[in-house]
Amino acid sequence: MANVVEALVSGGKATAGPPLGPALGPLGVNVAAVVAKINELTKDLNGMQVPVKIIVKSRTEFEIEVGTPPTSALLLKEAGVEKGSGDKKNFVGDISMDQVIKVAEIKRKNLLSSNLKSAVSEIVGTCGTLGIKIDGLTSKEVQKALASGSYDHLFEAKS
């Protein structure tokens, strides 16, 4: 029977310390090998918090499934800032609609949206919470523009 360990690790920088070591040690698997594989699989997400699922089949056999980082982490990376404002009236960054679409495409399978436009709308809402503007506009202004069809040409190109 396989054991499953789920953890949130720093992309490309996982260590044998908590949370991985204490969870994997009792299973008898080579923790160093698991950590090395996680770091290899998450190196492109360097420094971002990444959810991983480790499926330990035996002492020598394991699989690793890498999830997508939280939407907020992807947006903060796109904006080049470390944390959101915490206040919807203060803005910490500004990203382009293309960057919002990029994040929506990455997160698409994890969202409840039925199409790219509604996925983008969800991401725009998160931008507002973090204090990130889109093309110089607030999230509310962008939501109105989305609803009126102002950005539809961008979604037609992606279909």
Curated annotation (Swiss-Prot):
Gene Ontology cellular component list: large ribosomal subunit
Gene3D superfamilies: Ribosomal protein L11, C-terminal domain, Ribosomal protein L11/L12, N-terminal domain
GO process terms (BP): translation
Stored Pfam families: Ribosomal_L11, Ribosomal_L11_N
Presence of keyword Nucleotide-binding: no
Cysteines engaged in disulfide bonds, as pairs: none
GO molecular function: large ribosomal subunit rRNA binding; structural constituent of ribosome
Swiss-Prot/TrEMBL keywords: Ribonucleoprotein, Ribosomal protein, RNA-binding, rRNA-binding
Taxonomy, superkingdom: Archaea
Assembly notes: Part of the ribosomal stalk of the 50S ribosomal subunit. Interacts with L10 and the large rRNA to form the base of the stalk. L10 forms an elongated spine to which L12 dimers bind in a sequential fashion forming a multimeric L10(L12)X complex.
Protein purpose: Forms part of the ribosomal stalk which helps the ribosome interact with GTP-bound translation factors.
Family assignment from sequence similarity: Belongs to the universal ribosomal protein uL11 family.
Protein name: Large ribosomal subunit protein uL11
Lineage: Archaea, Methanobacteriati, Methanobacteriota, Stenosarchaea group, Methanomicrobia
